[in-house]
Amino acid sequence: MREKEPSGLLVLDKPEGMTSSTLVTRVKRLLGLRKAGHCGTLDPFATGVLLVCVNQATRFAEQLTGQTKVYRFTARLGIETDTLDRTGTVVRTRDDVVPSERELLEAVRLHEGTQVQEVPRYAAVKVQGKRLYELARKGIDVELPRREVHIHRFDLISYRYPEVVLETKCSKGTYVRQLAADLGRRLGCGAHVMHLRRLACGPFGLERASSLEQMHDGASDGSWLAKLVPMADALSHLPALTIEDGQVLSRLRYGQLDADWEAEHSGRFSRRVGPVRIVTADGRLAALWWPWPESEHQRRLRVFQL
């Protein structure tokens, strides 16, 4: 009988100069994983929290990508680049505008809340079937998409012209590079991101993150398994129901949800609720259940091997 494969969530600290996909590939090979995938790309020059779903957990990765993110970054005032970060080509400089700390604080506050943000020219978003960065490299101009994002908070950490350190908690889809560029334009001097570090993704912060070196050390003796967040805990932001009835659980393992149990519990949730965790008495994730699917064609149950 094949040994049960480990499933759960790894919280990694992505190093500078590596793509998110490359880090996942290395960890997957290092740990001998069958499946692995990350939840939210970090630019190669950026560092910090990268969530990686392992084996069965890849089946709920979409439930993690929408969580709020926290970033700390250093912006360089007075210089704009085509990529909006230090990896790009300088397109504009302005050293005759030196904002005061008060002006900077006022501008930062104006960026809090819900806003429509333009997607940067150098981004992986597709337009006309092509990624924006591919079109930008070819010199092809297109109308850039715009997205509604929410800046929960935007804090000034330190300021010594021309460098300013900022921290933000923001919604899914927020481009920090664009946030810095917009701030620079509001100040009248322009700006680009020099350093970017993701401090947290949802409830998972750097204090729980492991480096690639730590994963390498833990691969030889299996100690990396202690870093694996159980699937039910990885989805702690979702509501949960515990199944203690052995017969109901037995049917669930075969992809069938007891009709009486479903009728009894569906009324506990509003029609706006998404998936609900169904967990065993000992806290393991048995399934995701949609009590109120958005359409009659949507699957209502996603079962996981115990």
Swiss-Prot record:
Top class in the EC scheme: isomerase
GO biological process, one term: mRNA pseudouridine synthesis
tRNA processing found in the keyword field: yes
Official protein name in the record: tRNA pseudouridine synthase B
EC code: 5.4.99.25
Pfam families for the chain: TruB_C_2, TruB_N
Entries under NCBIfam families matching the protein: TruB
Membrane-spanning residues: none
Any one GO molecular-function label of the UniProt entry: tRNA pseudouridine(55) synthase activity
Species assigned in the record: Syntrophobacter fumaroxidans (strain DSM 10017 / MPOB)
Keywords: Isomerase, tRNA processing
Catalytic activity: uridine(55) in tRNA = pseudouridine(55) in tRNA
Active site: D43
Signal peptide: none
Similarity comment: Belongs to the pseudouridine synthase TruB family. Type 1 subfamily.
